[in-house]
Swiss-Prot record:
Pfam families: Glyco_transf_41 (PF13844), TPR_1 (PF00515), TPR_10 (PF13374), TPR_16 (PF13432), TPR_8 (PF13181). Belongs to the glycosyltransferase 41 family. O-GlcNAc transferase subfamily. Probable O-linked N-acetylglucosamine transferase (OGT) involved in various processes such as gibberellin (GA) signaling pathway and circadian clock. OGTs catalyze the addition of nucleotide-activated sugars directly onto the polypeptide through O-glycosidic linkage with the hydroxyl of serine or threonine. Probably acts by adding O-linked sugars to yet unknown proteins. Acts as a repressor of GA signaling pathway to inhibit hypocotyl elongation. Functions with GIGANTEA (GI) in pathways controlling flowering, circadian cotyledon movements and hypocotyl elongation. It is found in: Cytoplasm; Nucleus. Residues 1-39, 866-914 are annotated as: Disordered. It is an enzyme of class 2 (transferase). One of its GO terms (cellular component) is cytoplasm. The lineage of its organism: Eukaryota, Viridiplantae, Streptophyta, Embryophyta, Tracheophyta. This is Probable UDP-N-acetylglucosamine--peptide N-acetylglucosaminyltransferase SPINDLY.
């Protein structure tokens, strides 16, 4: 903290008022008061008249009288002093000094003359000589108060000079000498306060400032600096009180107004972090009252409004913060976050680039720019940005997570998992990396061991211990009463999950199964509003929960008396597993959005069917499996799909195989099998569509891999992401046969393919993710296209391609075949689903609650084994919950790149002090 030394030249000298020294001695004769009309020319009357003229600032007239007197009596000490004072007011210091010196020569103990000599020395900057003169005056007359006051001033100035020269202790000594001379001299206390503040002896500093304010109640600077000390100590309320006292005596004191704005901004952040966002906003606004262009208050208002989901207001205040502080890279960064969440990626890129033009090594903006480039499929540019972020901050855990997302999207699962694990080394509690790692492991899991199950279980146990669980509910245990079903998901928009949740929302019997939707959609679209209107029209309840803390959502679920809570996301983007971990509903279920166990001991059931998870499956689950009578999915086609196009092979003269699955599913083994098929079917072609193919290096790597497998690149067409759903669906007109992926099969892509008349070849496996295609194709009536192994997969594909006429016939009938199958029979599906819910509820009413048994086992294991307790002990979970999931083609969107990171909220600016 830097304080301004009290410049005693700003102090009005107590010695001179209207040119006259307070307490100067009169001559031995009494000076009478003359009337203006009376002409006095001699003796003491003349001296008195001259003194009166001088007191009335008529210095020229007074000077003439003094000079006239001295011509007659050169030894008149009072006349010499009076003449000196008049000359002093005319800035004739040398002549004035001669007059005072002559007076001293005539009267060596004249305190008034000695004091005025000191004043002249001080005006010339000769502080030592000034002090000596004042000391002589006091030696001549110890009771002469003006000399004492002047000596205190000059000793204070000497102290300041010594301190500025680096002689702090000697300076302090001078301040104390000043106070010894004049114990009521406030500036000496004030300057001691400044010195002690610089020495970080804040208790001493406060004591000195308080004494300065006591001696001079209007001492604004002292109040201001007291406020600075309290603010730096974290006592914001006391700091604000001091600034208020300062501004009460000096309303236009700019330093204090600025400091008040800083303190109010910090107090706003403090109360906001304690949970009172509204009061925080009030303090930020009050800060702007004191400093209307204070960028930090505007910035923090942007943060607060963002947390309140008032994004338009947040944008306004970030823009203002940047306007008033063009060096505020954080404001640009956070603007980028908001624009990205609104899908305005070009504007987001512009904001991040602006932030980086201010702070080239700003790790957050480097990371966030990499996130946007990843979303856009610009993998090379994304990798460059994220690697720069890591270089700028090697311990930036989420940057490693985002690198993993990039590798996953580029199809390099091994490197993705390595990156996630690197993130977890830095931040073991990174929720994004932990869940992304689990998801990534599904892409290469063939069910040969239990490693993936153990990874889910361990994550689930650890995560559950971070949340308090409800263990009892007020829900009436009546097995036959209407049941309240809660669906919770961020994917009630044009997203893969939406195609499978629409049937239940539409066809539930709302008289027996009340539906409550908890929508965590980041950005609602037309489908969101259509779903909401449909639910409300049928008597259900729709609640938007985006941005609400997961534990608060759990409280909402409990207050709504949800009987069965169904989460639809698993370990994918923006999931609400934190709510599920609190166990707010008596029965909890996972379904649709994730092809594996959640790992949470608080989830009772996972919905599936006997083909996706056969009764003899070796795959382990934390949840108890509930198999629906037909397919565990019911697909509602997009109304924008358009008509089925003729088989392209009829006009092309060759068969085109294709896949619109993401690259993460197209593993090296999948490419080997596809290459075998293409090589076995002369002149056939392969069309693959996915987002990263807008990147040349990804395209080239993909083509090179196929060429190494014997497939010429000229036989391969690679398409990037197609934005509009109608165009995406019509792109199926390019292929004759769809090739499924393994061991992570397609879901939405398979349904889309079949609906557009394109038969799909799939392969059965040992895990749920592998068998989704088996369930879909079998229930549509295409069980003959399910292979048992790779060789059969190749042969089925080759055989299907060998008869174009039969292929064409199948294509033109496939939509009707699918529409009449259980896969698209919404009413029938809803009945089966409701039956499953009813059975779950009946079990609960009987006291059969799988999750309670697991929780008891978990608590027993933790109690019996201290190592488990240590491993699973409470720890902080870092959740970055604002990244928007990209539209996925088949059923599960990964937990996204961690959020474009928002910058810290605390004010950055240092206090100024008086």
């Amino acid at each position: 903290m830097v304080g301004l030394e009290d410049d005693t030249e700003r102090e009005r000298s107590p010695v001179v008022e209207n040119g006259f020294s307070n307490g100067s001695r009169s001559s031995s004769s009494s000076a009478g008061v003359l009337s203006p009309s009376r002409k006095v020319t001699q003796g003491n009357d003349t001296l008195s008249y001259a003194n009166i003229l001088r007191a009335r600032n008529k210095f020229a007239d007074a000077l003439a009288l003094y000079e006239a007197m001295l011509e007659k009596d050169s030894k008149n000490v009072e006349a010499h002093i009076g003449k000196g004072i008049c000359l002093q007011t005319q800035n004739k210091g040398n002549l004035a000094f001669d007059c005072f010196s002559e007076a001293i020569r005539l009267d060596p103990h004249n305190a008034c003359a000695l004091t005025h000599c000191g004043i002249l020395h001080k005006e010339e900057g000769r502080l030592v000589e000034a002090a000596e003169s004042y000391q002589k005056a006091l030696m001549a007359d110890a009771s002469y108060k003006p000399a004492a006051e002047c000596l205190a001033i000059v000793l204070t100035d000497l102290g300041t000079s010594l301190k500025l020269a680096g002689n702090t202790q000697e300076g302090i000594q001078k301040y104390y000498e000043a106070l010894k001379i004049d114990p009521h001299y406030a500036p000496a206390y004030y300057n001691l306060g400044v010195v002690y503040s610089e020495m970080m002896q804040y208790d001493n500093a406060l004591s000195c400032y308080e004494k300065a304010a006591l001696e001079r109640p209007m001492y604004a600077e002292a109040y201001c600096n007291m406020g600075v000390i309290y603010k730096n100590r974290g006592d914001l309320e006391m700091a604000i009180t001091c600034y208020e006292r300062c501004l009460a005596v000096s309303p236009n004191f700019e330093i204090a107004k600025n400091n008040m704005a800083i303190a109010l901004t910090d107090l706003g952040t403090k109360v906001k972090l304690e949970g009172d966002v509204t009061q925080g906003v009030a303090y930020y606004k009050k800060a702007l009252y004191y400093n209307w262009h204070y960028a930090d208050a505007m910035y923090n208002l942007g943060v607060a409004y963002g947390e309140m989901l008032k994004f338009d207001m947040a944008i306004v205040f970030y823009e203002l913060a940047f306007h008033f502080n063009p060096h505020c890279a954080e404001a640009c960064n956070n603007l980028g976050v908001l624009y990205k969440d609104r899908d305005n990626l070009d504007k987001a890129v512009e904001c991040y680039q602006m932030a980086l033009s201010i702070k080239p090594n700003f790790a957050q903006s480097l990371n966030n720019l990499g996130v946007v480039y990843t979303v856009q499929g610009k993998m090379d540019a994304a990798a460059s940005m994220i690697e720069k972020a890591i270089l700028a901050n090697p311990t930036y855990a989420e940057a490693f997570n985002n690198l993993g997302v990039l590798y996953r999207d580029a199809g390099n699962i091994t490197m993705a998992i390595d990156a996630y694990e690197e993130c977890l080394k830095i931040d073991p509690d990174s929720r994004n990396a932990g869940q992304n790692r689990l998801l990534a492991m599904n892409y290469i899991n063939e069910g040969l061991d239990d490693k993936l199950f153990e990874a889910h279980r361990d994550w689930g146990w650890r995560f559950t211990r971070l949340h308090p669980q409800y263990t009892s509910w007020d829900n009436l245990k009546d097995p036959e009463r209407p049941i309240t079903i809660g669906y919770i998901s961020p994917d009630f928009f044009t997203h893969s999950v939406s195609y499978f949740i629409e049937a239940p929302l539409t066809h539930h019997d709302y008289t027996k199964y009340k539906v409550v939707v908890y929508s965590a959609v980041v950005k609602a679209d037309a489908k969101t509003y259509r779903f909401r209107d449909k639910v409300l029209k049928k008597g259900g309840v729709w609640k938007d929960i985006y941005g609400i803390d997961e534990k608060k959502i759990a409280s909402m679920v409990r207050e709504d008396k949800i009987d069965i809570l169904v989460e639809l996301t698993g370990h994918t983007a923006n999931n609400k597993l934190g709510t599920m971990a609190c166990r707010p509903a008596p029965v909890q279920v996972t379904w649709i959005g994730y092809p594996n166990t959640t790992g949470l001991p608080t989830v009772d059931y996972r919905i599936t069917d006997s083909l996706a998870d056969p009764p003899d499956t070796k795959q382990k689950q934390v949840e108890e499996l509930v198999r629906l009578p037909d397919c565990f999915l019911c697909y509602t086609p997009s109304p924008e799909a358009g008509p089925v196009c003729p088989t392209p092979a009829l006009s092309n003269g060759f068969v085109t195989f294709g896949s619109f699955n993401n690259l993460a599913k197209i593993t090296p083994k999948v490419l080997q099998v596809w290459a075998r098929i293409l090589c076995a079917v002369p002149n056939s072609r392969l069309v693959v569509k996915c987002k990263p193919f807008c990147c040349d290096s990804i395209r080239q790597r993909f083509l090179t891999t196929l060429e190494q497998l014997g497939l010429e690149s000229k036989r391969v067409d690679l398409l990037p992401l197609i934005l509009f759903n109608h165009d995406h669906m019509q792109a199926y007109s390019l292929m004759d046969i769809s090739l499924d992926t393994f061991p992570y099969a397609g879901t939405t892509t398979t349904c889309e393919s079949l609906y557009m008349g394109v038969p799909c070849v799939t392969m059965a496996g040992s895990v749920h993710a592998h068998n989704v295609g088996v369930s879909l194709l079998t229930k549509v009536g295409l069980g003959h296209l399910v292979a048992k192994n790779e060789d059969e997969y190749v042969q089925l594909s080759v055989d299907l391609a060998s008869d174009v006429t039969a292929l064409s016939k199948l294509r033109m009938s496939l939509r009707d075949l699918m529409a009449g199958s259980p896969v698209c029979n919404g009413p029938s599906f809803a009945v089966g689903l409701e039956s499953a819910y009813r059975n779950m509820w009946k079990k609960y009413c009987k006291g059969e609650v799988p999750s309670l048994r697991r929780m008891e086992m978990l608590q027993k294991e933790v109690h019996d084994d201290p190592l488990i307790s240590k491993d699973l002990g409470p720890s902080r979970v870092s959740v970055t919950g604002e990244a928007t999931p990209s539209l996925k083609a088949n059923g599960s969107a990964p937990v996204p790149s961690s959020l474009p990171t928002q910058s810290p909220q605390l004010s950055k600016r240092m206090d100024s002090t008086s």
